[in-house]
Each structure stands twice: as structure tokens, then as C-alpha cells.
């Protein structure tokens, strides 16, 4: 428990505190497709309430109630995020549901950046990269960004793609990758030169939970964010109530240790009510970068 000059005066003898110990998720979907949940009630989990990662996605949650058990006074019912959806080809539909008393974000929906590990023979068209499986395919157009300045480094089409299988080469390629960014290592050949150096970010526009919907939900009581949306495209957030949260919403990308992305586009947010909510954050990257 850290006490500083900034918070010492609000802590008193007899205060009720909770220190969650994060363990496994209550519900975990990995590589699944179109799983539908109706009329589910959850009162506690040592980790995330519901996590879905990888695969086709398109999962649906209808009248999914996750809150502390009635009659209890728990500050936390869940040890991490509530809904955590990542790297799905199709985003989730969450309707008429409730999420509350989490030890992290109530709803977190995101993709994942790719990462340039090195230039092969210092080439600007032949790169060794890290990327989640299936996110980059031959014929796909991808963008490159500087990890620190967010300056745009170019666009190219993938002409060939070869997965690296040598364990020593894989370990060397991953040596300087940011902490929570993981995936397979590939050698790619691009249609044209790009100014992408080692540690550049790759925006591959795939497996970013596109088309997600959060509608008619009640999200409340967390020290952290009601919504954290990192790069999920073509989403709709409407007719929700967000109350008693540290931050109402945060729409951006994360380039630090988590590498959650990529950049948001075509997001509709309408008819939502925020009560006793902190800042509503939007991060954008102007043409040419330099967002910081």
C-alpha cells in the first residue's frame, strides 16, 4: 500500500481496503468462433471475468450479469478486467449486460501491433517481424509507424511470407521486443521500400475485433476505465450507462509494454450516459505522426 502526500489525507484508521490477487479467468475462450451466452450471472473471479482471444471471434453476450454477490460489500468481485476481448477477427456483441466491481477495466477490446525485429541484410523491403498468427497474409497492405514518435514510416504490400522455425533465431528476434507483445516470427518481402527500422510498429489491420457492439449495458464501480478500446475498428458503443469509474472511456492505442492496438477508425459512440466518471480520453495520430 503506497501512501504519498497526494493521498495520505484521505486514508484513515478503520478504512476498508481490498488487495486482489490475480489468478485465472472465470471464462476463457481461445481460438473460438461465434460462442453465444444468454442469461449468465457471475459473482466472482480471481482474474478476469471473461477473456476471449484469437480466432474468428464474433461471440455474443446477452443479459450477462457480472457483479458482486447481493448482500456483500466487496470492493472487488473480479481480479482484473471484466470483458477482455483481443485479437479476434470479428469483435463481440455485448448487449443488455452488466459489469462491475473489477480490479481493472470493465470492458477492454483491442488488437495487437506487429513489430519489426530487424531488417534482413539491412534491406528496406526484406524484414524480420513478430506478429500474431494469421494477422499478416500475402497480398495484404500494411502500415509502419515509429514506436516512440508515432511518425509514419510507410505503406507496402506483403509479397511473400515465411515463418521462422529455428529456435535460436526466434529467441534472438524476440530479445528486444516489448514485454507483453508476443507472436510468431516471420520473414517478409514487401512490394516497395519503407523507412521501418528495428522496433517499428506494424499496423496490419487484421484481428483487431472489428465490428464490435456494446449496447444497452450498465457498467459501474471500478477505479479504472469503463471502456478501453485500443484499435478495434468499425465498432458501435451506444445506449450504455457508465457510473462510478476512474475514467469513463479511453479510446487510443498502447505502444508501451502491452502493444495493444492498433489505431482506431470508424468508431461510433452515441447516446451513452456517464455519471461520476473521470476523463473521457481520445488519442489520435495526425498525418505524419508526432502525437506525443
Describe the predicted segments one by one:
Residues 1-292:
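Extracellular parallel beta-helix/beta-solenoid repeat domains
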Amino acid at each position: 500500500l503506497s501512501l504519498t502526500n497526494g493521498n495520505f489525507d484521505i486514508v484513515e484508521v478503520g478504512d476498508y481496503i481490498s488487495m486482489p490477487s490475480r489468478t485465472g479467468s472465470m471464462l476463457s475462450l481461445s481460438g473460438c468462433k461465434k460462442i453465444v451466452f444468454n442469461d449468465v450471472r457471475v459473482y466472482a473471479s480471481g482474474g478476469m471475468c471473461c477473456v476471449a482471444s484469437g480466432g474468428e471471434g464474433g461471440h455474443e453476450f446477452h443479459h450477462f450479469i457480472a457483479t458482486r454477490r447481493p448482500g456483500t460489500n466487496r470492493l472487488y468481485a473480479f481480479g482484473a478486467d471484466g470483458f477482455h476481448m483481443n485479437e479476434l477477427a470479428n469483435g463481440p456483441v455485448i448487449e443488455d449486460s452488466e459489469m462491475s466491481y473489477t480490479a481493472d477495466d470493465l470492458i477492454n477490446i483491442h488488437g495487437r501491433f506487429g513489430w519489426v525485429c530487424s531488417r534482413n541484410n539491412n534491406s528496406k523491403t526484406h524484414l524480420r517481424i513478430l506478429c500474431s498468427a494469421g494477422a499478416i497474409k500475402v497480398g495484404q497492405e500494411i502500415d509502419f509507424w515509429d514506436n516512440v514518435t508515432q511518425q509514419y514510416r510507410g505503406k507496402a504490400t506483403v509479397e511473400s511470407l515465411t515463418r521462422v522455425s529455428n529456435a535460436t533465431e526466434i529467441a534472438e528476434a524476440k530479445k528486444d521486443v516489448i514485454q507483453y507483445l508476443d507472436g510468431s516470427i516471420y520473414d517478409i518481402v514487401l512490394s516497395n521500400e519503407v523507412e521501418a527500422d528495428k522496433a517499428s510498429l506494424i499496423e496490419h489491420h487484421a484481428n483487431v475485433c472489428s465490428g464490435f457492439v456494446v449496447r444497452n449495458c450498465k457498467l459501474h464501480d471500478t477505479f479504472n476505465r469503463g471502456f478501453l478500446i485500443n484499435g478495434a475498428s468499425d465498432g458501435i458503443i451506444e445506449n450504455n450507462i457508465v457510473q462510478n469509474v476512474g475514467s469513463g472511456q479511453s479510446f487510443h492505442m498502447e505502444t508501451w509494454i502491452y502493444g495493444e492496438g492498433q489505431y482506431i477508425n470508424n468508431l461510433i459512440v452515441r447516446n451513452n450516459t456517464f455519471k461520476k466518471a473521470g476523463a473521457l480520453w481520445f488519442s489520435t495520430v495526425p498525418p505524419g505522426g508526432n502525437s506525443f
